[in-house]
Amino acid sequence: PFVLRRKKEQVARELPPKTEITQWVELTPAQRDRYEILRLAMDRKVREEITRQGLARSQIVILEALLRLRQVCCDLRLLDEAPAELTSADSGKLSSLLDMLEALIGEGRRVLLFSQFTSMLTLIESELQARGIGYAKLTGSTRDRRTPVEQFQAGEVPIFLISLKAGGAGL
C-alpha cells in the first residue's frame, strides 16, 4: 500500500506546535484481575507455541496475546467473554477519557479522538450519546467520508471519532 506522509510544516504552517500530554490511568480492580489472568494464560500459550514452532513461526500467537492485553487495558467489553453488565465505570481509561472530554468541551475545545479499535469507538460513541454530546465518526465502514469531516470542520460537533485505519487514508 502507498502511504502519503506530509509534515505539518509543508501543509499547515499556521497551526500551533503540537502539544502532547501523557496521562497515566490506573486499571480498575476488575481490569487488573482480568489482565493478570490473561497475562498468565497468554504467557503459557506463547511459551508453548515458541517451544513447538520456534520464535519466527510464533508471531501470530505473540501478536494475539499483545492485542488481547491491550483490549483489557482499554475496556473489558472489548473481550468476547466480557460480562454483559459492565459499564464505562468498569474501565479506567474510558472513565478518564469521558472526564477529560467534558472538561475540554467545557473550555470550548474541539477534539480529534483516534482509536485502533472501532469497537472502542462504538463504546465511546454510546457514552457520548448518553451524555448528549455531539460528535462525528469516521471508520472504515463510513460510506460518506466527506460529511463527518465537514461537520467537524464547520464546528457543528466538538468531537471527531476516527479509526486509525480510516483516518490514515487521505484525510
Pin down the residues of each PLM region.
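Non-catalytic, charged helical/coil tracts that couple and regulate nucleotide-powered enzyme cores
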Residues: 5-6, 10-14
